[in-house]
Amino acid sequence: YYEQTGQQDLYKQQLDSLLMNKKVPADTKLNVMRQVIAQNEQATADSTKVISLFDRILQQDPDDDQIPMLYSQYLWAKNMKEASVPVLERVVQIDPANKAARLMLLEVAVQKNDFEQVIKICEPGVEATPEALEFYFYLAIAYSQAERNDEVLAICQKALANATNDSKK
């Protein structure tokens, strides 16, 4: 209503009270944030306002991984991959089986040739999502770079044991 009638200050106040209210379900906040992003993009406005809003929401320490995941996707869309790393780490802390977040973290680490970070990402990745063969693949490469040859062999054998006819190869 406030937005439709041009009362921007009241609209922002209402938006803040909704997004900062711990009693509002995460799905509702997620839908509101999607709308905020869409409006911001249509207006070609500065992304810092959206980023600031996400940061304030995350300070509430939600147990739901959807809002931090949306935030990290927003940062990627704005070509701010490095800034997304702590947010993505939070997502995999909340949900270790979140394959998309782990793959995004992996991409950043691989681009930096940070094989120690690849190991830190992929070791829990193979435990949380044993069917995701890509984590075994990158883990084997990182172990090889670290000259941990016994672990290369062990992780390749573990990957073969978890591969099925339906696995992406």
Functional labels for PLM-detected ranges:
Residues Y1-K169:
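Alpha-solenoid helical repeat scaffolds
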